[in-house]
Amino acid sequence: MGMPAPKPARRVRRLAKSTRKRCAVARASVVGKVTVTVPAETPIDDVVDVVSRLIRFDTTNTGELETTKGEAECAHWVAAQLADVGYQVEYLESGAPGRGNVFARLKGADSSRGALLIHGHLDVVPAEPAEWSVHPFSGAIEDGYVWGRGAVDMKDMVGMMIVIARHFRRSGIVPPRDLVFAFVADEENGGKYGSQWLVDNRPDLFEGITEAIGEVGGFSLTVPRRDGGERRLYLIETAEKSMHWMRLTARGRPGHGSMVHDHNAVTTLAEAVARLGRHRFPLVPTDSVVQFLTAVGEETGFTFDTDSPDLDGAVEKLGPIARIVKATLRDTANPTMLKAGYKTNVVPATAEAVVDCRILPGRLAAFEAEVDELIGPDVTREWTTSLPSYETTFDGDLVDAMNAALLAVDPDARTVPYMLSGGTDAKAFERLGIRCFGFAPLRLPPDLDFTALFHGIDERVPVDALKFGTEVLAHFLTHC
């Protein structure tokens, strides 16, 4: 622990110093027709310890209220960090004891503009310590990384938010528009006791907000250039598939395990689940996916024919990120849980399966028709969770501000839109008409399999990337 930072970290610090010098000369900047105060110095080094501290709060979300500790302890700590520098903080619990959320607003220079929501979730998925190189809730700082559950999903962004919010308030920095910092519960279970509850029960918290940024966007993907060398693409999330969790139920004739018959619920269910799990739904490239592949093709010279049945194979050229991209080319139905029986020698009357379905925008009816054909008449289905898809366009002043912020710190950057195969709290906020993007900037090592870290063993985030992201985000929030 506490090892010296590798060379890339020193480069980030040099970039930070040069930025500080520029900002120190100009304490004010004109954004549009409004003069706003800009930062003289962003304390980017602070983010490492803040993220480490956040990870040490065990905010595991099992998906069951009975076994989920909740986010309250962590949320109270976040609230204290903001109150300490003068924010009027609202702490509230969302639908169940211990499900803590924190909101704080920073007034901007132009009150006539819509506010910007910067949101992050405090909960994390479970982790088994025996499987990890370090304890998942240690927040260890080793080998140039901060380790632990939540390091990339998403206490990295939460840490950046805290550092920047404190710095802006302490330094008297006035952004161009109102900023609303939201730290919420239960994202890892669809937001039932978090963002969804807040939107349904406390819409006043989002009054005046027109746009939002959150997780799983703004990270770099290094690709080979067609003329030699490499290019860093920064993926801005502009779309998400819908999230539908489905329960399948087969009913059969119960009986003694020694006597075989043709109405075994377990057999019926297993056959249906196997058909569904092996099925590949049709390719339906969306606007965000087409724009992403077009941009990658321009840089690399790779050909991506979105009308080709072998588009999956072409996407494999992208390396580890191909897992996410391939999952956005079509609908998916992934069996994740099975339940049947209570004794070895008893044939059960029912058998159940749970399937995680992620569906492209506008595809729900067609998806349901395909599923019904696959599972057959002897298996019933029901949705246990249904959260919508969304897609926005890759344009406008906010996108321009993201691009400018990245270029200010990484002149070789290029921003590109992409679709997330998973889901975020943006699904809830979009219901209020808020235009949502994924923008949690990280400059990553080219050989880091970033997507494998989400919900993975030995989840970790580079120290350099945290400092880079804090600098980019601070620039963005003074020009948004």
Where are the regions that the model predicts?
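Low-acidity, Ser/Thr- and Arg-rich intrinsically disordered low-complexity segments
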Residues: P8-R14, S18-C23, S29
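Metal-dependent amide/peptide-bond hydrolase catalytic core
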Residues: V31-T42, G218-A239, M243-A474, T478
